[in-house]
Regions:
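Generic structural signal for hydrophobic core residues of well-folded globular domains
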Residues: 15-19, 71, 299, 314-317, ...
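Short coil/turn segments at secondary-structure boundaries
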Residues: 27-28, 324-330
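Short, charged, low-complexity patches
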Residues: 158-162, 307, 347, 351
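An anionic, glycine-rich sequence signature occurring as long contiguous blocks
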Residues: 204-319
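A short, flexible helix-boundary coil/loop motif
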Residues: 230-257, 329-412
Length: 412
């Protein structure tokens, strides 16, 4: 066999890192000797093991898809999870903790619409449920992926997201048995079964709380806030240089349940109303209404500062939405059908998540030091520089000779 299995996997992974969002783009430069040598060095196959007289090439997409059709998703998933576990163990993700709990956002995403196979009435739409560690700096590192069983209707998809969540949290718990986790999600997950799971595992939760999801509990929380006039205060947000800025009002209440029965799950609700200050052309300041929302949580809320922190972390659920947007429109190819085979498709999706994780760490830890004096360069420009470097220069240094101090000093 010309290529090792590691080389085949690295060909796909490097394609995602270099934002090649289709298989044709991955294959367009496969005859480049510098790129081929880089892939061989990354995979550990080594150029010296290449057959004499054979031209250096990168594996084509059909070759690595042929390998991934036989499976490999558990091994790739383990690599994704181990990367995040390593960062947590080395205390590089302390910024992703709220009161000691690592904050994990959960949300479903449409992976792709697969090509309609022969004999099928319609094309299969594939969904995934993502668990991503989020942080105030915009970080959203994929930690675990659970497959959502396909349904044709949107309501069926939502039902399956909850079923996938129950499967996913068990596996996250198995991967991180002693890690305190705070689950952040949208209003779909603000229900008694999810809260009961968090209680059984000793986890915390901050979930978007909307009237349409639980009208009775929403009305109970709103009435309780109107009665408890003392449980309100100023909404405090972090401005530039982490300065505290008064930005609206916040209120909270406790003892809210989805059912009138005593055995129902009791939780706290925090509501906020943000006021945005804008400067007019004449220099005067005006206040405009900003974000308004409510969050269900099992954190103890005692004052307006704690309530403001709950609101801030609840709103950071948008980190995972932003990461999906980057994967869709930033060159990764999310929602693009790479392969009709579901095993290969799942493996490629996990490699995409691993590539995005690697890029986020690189962007947060390495680029700020390299980009001094080039602060206006976007990520797309840096990807283009990397792409040209791989094609023109490649990887020349021996990995064993790289100084470890650069890795130790990385801090998210």
């Amino acid at each position: 066999m010309l290529y090792d299995r590691e080389t085949l996997v690295w060909a796909a992974l490097l394609g995602y890192i270099l934002r090649r969002d289709t298989r044709n783009k991955m294959d367009c430069a496969r005859n480049d000797p510098a790129l081929a040598e880089s892939v061989l060095r990354l995979s550990g196959q080594g150029v010296e093991d290449w057959p004499d007289g054979e031209r250096l090439t990168v594996p084509c997409s059909e070759t690595f898809c042929g390998l991934l059709k036989h499976g490999g998703a558990p091994q790739i998933q383990r690599a994704v999870t181990d990367m995040v576990a390593h960062l947590i163990r080395k205390k590089r993700l302390e910024c992703a903790r709220f009161r000691g709990y690592v904050v994990v956002a959960v949300d479903g995403v449409e992976q792709e619409v697969a090509r309609r196979t022969k004999g099928a009435k319609e094309a299969e739409t594939r969904y995934m449920l993502e668990f991503k560690v989020i942080a105030p700096n915009g970080l959203a590192l994929s930690t675990f992926t659970e497959r959502v069983m396909p349904h044709a209707t949107e309501s069926g998809k939502r039902d399956c997201e909850l079923a996938a969540l129950k499967r996913g949290v068990r596996r996250v718990r198995k991967a991180f048995p002693r890690l305190p986790i705070c689950l952040v999600g949208d209003a779909l997950y603000a229900c008694a079964p999810v809260m009961r799971i968090c209680r059984d595992y000793g986890w915390k939760f901050i979930l978007t709380f909307k009237e349409g999801r639980s009208p009775d509990a929403y009305e109970l929380a709103r009435d309780s806030m109107e009665v408890s006039k003392g449980q309100c205060g100023t909404l405090v947000v972090r401005g530039q240089n982490q300065r505290k800025v008064d930005s609206g009002v916040v209120a909270w209440t406790g003892g809210v349940r989805f059912t009138t029965q005593e055995e129902g799950e009791a939780f706290n609700v925090v509501a906020c109303e943000e006021h945005v200050k804008r400067k007019a052309d004449d220099g005067s300041e005006t206040e405009e209404p900003g974000y308004r929302g409510m969050f269900a949580t099992n954190f103890d809320v005692s004052d307006h500062e704690v309530a403001s922190e709950v609101v801030a972390w609840g709103r950071r659920r948008w980190n995972i939405e932003s990461s999906f947007n980057v994967e869709k429109h930033g060159g990764y190819g999310l929602e693009h059908s790479f392969c009709s085979d579901w095993r290969c498709s799942r493996c490629l999706y996990l490699l995409m998540q691993l590539a995005h994780n690697l890029w986020q760490v690189y962007n947060a830890c390495v680029l700020p030091k390299v980009a001094e004096g080039c602060r206006k360069m976007g990520q797309a420009e840096w990807v283009e520089i990397l792409r040209r470097h791989f094609h023109m220069v490649g990887i020349r240094a021996d990995f064993a000779t790289l100084p470890r101090r650069y890795i130790r000093r990385m801090d998210l």
